[in-house]
Amino acid sequence: MAHPASNLPPVLRPEHPPVRALDDLAARFGTSTRGETDGVTLTGVTLATADLRPGEAFVAIQGVNRHGAEFAAQAAEKGAVAVVTDAAGADIAAGSGLPIVIVDSPRAVLGDLSAWVYGTGADDELPLLFGTTGTNGKTSVSHLLEGILNQLGVVTGLSSTAERHIAGQVIVSRLTTPEASEFHALLALMRERGVEAVAVEVSAQALSRHRVDGLMFDVAGFTNLSHDHLDDYADMREYFEAKLQLFHPDRSRRGVVSLDSSAGAEVAARSEVPVVTVICPAIAADPDAAADWTVEILEERQDGTTFRLAGPDGRSLTTVVPTIGRHMAANAGPAIVMLLEGGYAWESFVAALDGGRIEAYLPGRTERVSGERGPAVYVDFGHSPDAFEKTLAAVRHVTPGKVLFVMGADGDRDATKRLDMGRTGAEGSDIFIVTDHHPRFEEPDSIRATLLEGARRAGTPTELHEYSPPERAILEAVKLVGEGDAILWCGPGHQDYRDIRGVRTPYSARELSRRALRDAGWPVPEPHWPVPYPDDDTPLSDPTRDWR
């Protein structure tokens, strides 16, 4: 797959969108109108004036600080044919010269409205949709779904935190789950290009904020639940209830639920659609829980994890997931079962996978960025205590020497997990380096101090270090390890920027790691990820070079 040259997501629209009448839109979704709507037609909808194309309707919602209707005149200049907004927005947009359709809640109606505009609703002819939710593993399951489907000869689409794919074309991703208008346009484009099945990562926020409204998932998957996102939700119960929404007949037809976390049993019990269950006893909270399918870990190596998937009627296959970690095998098993529930024949999985391996690339998910010699260096997107615990255990299992852990925490995000993040990092490593991640508008010194306090509370003999610049952190990390040792850098994963006081600066933990190894004299592979830095041989440690 070719990576995009720009790190800005493109505006994606179907090449041949349906033409809809504004009067029909108003009749279906509106409570009233202002201005002349007769004879007005539209070919798309968007929330963002920056993405608006001529002939589209601009949907204006109330934001945190401003109402989107304040940009109605700008939308008109870019060729918008109408504004869809609430009563307050209609008053603000009155001077734009555009006809206005008033709805009770533009955010709540956007999904169904977009599905109607693009013909991507539950009753329309679409690719099969596989949606995965859970705290950890959503991205991995989505990429594994895509990889397995490709091995079955299926033309695929993907929407994940890391990337979006349309039949092999790679597109930059910014949100785990795109806004509803963007997603329905993407799905319509995928349909035009012959995509037969789509793997979708569905966040709790997407469910709460109506981003997947108007979609019908053929199969929904649940991975696990652990401490995260309490900046968005009052408590873990509210967070759980948000994810449970995916298992409702308005959103999915069938479900596959992992019982590895204690929340899985409740999802299975309360699901309003038929579900089958999967368990990996090697990592499950209750390894004796009864499930329809079982993932048995057979071998863990640096080049992959071998597992056996066994289920009803004596069905069984043995294959390899191409990353380290029992938790990755625990992601792969449900991915296979989701596809089976989607209608693909068991015999096709046996032919493609049994005795072989899953061919999937998981960007920034326990991704090895080092060469064959020297310390093994892995970069991961994990940013929760549970993710740290599982990933550190995976690295420890395949590492004969020391394990060095590098991490930072997001600013302006759930701060209640930081002490546990620090504690888990110290418990799972021999050397622990705390650095900066996305400080956003928080003081990075304060973030690091909390992480280090958590590390000290672990009471382990772990060697602790603190370096504010990530560039310095990885340089020092490489100095502290050698052949047979491993570095795990958690947090950045696939990301190509850092957010510092609202400014996104080019950044790649994968490339920084590769160059730090190169500067230390270790052989390194060529990058197979976008490189946001100058492509030259200047050492990372050169004081004249500002890599940030």
Residue ranges and their predicted role:
Residues 90-95, 208, 217-376, 454-460, ...:
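Acidic, Mg2+-coordinating active-site environments of NTP-dependent enzymes
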Residues 25, 56, 75, 113, ...:
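Residue-level signal for inorganic ion chemistry
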Residues 44-45, 79-86, 200, 255-258, ...:
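Short, hydrophobic beta-strand segments that form beta-sheet elements in well-ordered domains
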Residues 81, 218, 430:
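Receiver (REC) domain switch/active-site residues of two-component response regulators
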Residues 109-259, 263-274, 399, 524, ...:
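Phosphate-binding loop of NTP-binding sites
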Residues 2-133, 141-152, 290-291, 301, ...:
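Short, basic phosphate-binding NTP loop
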Residues 1-34, 54-57, 67, 314, ...:
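ATP-dependent carboxylate-amine ligase
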Residues 85-88, 202, 224, 259, ...:
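Short secondary-structure boundary segments
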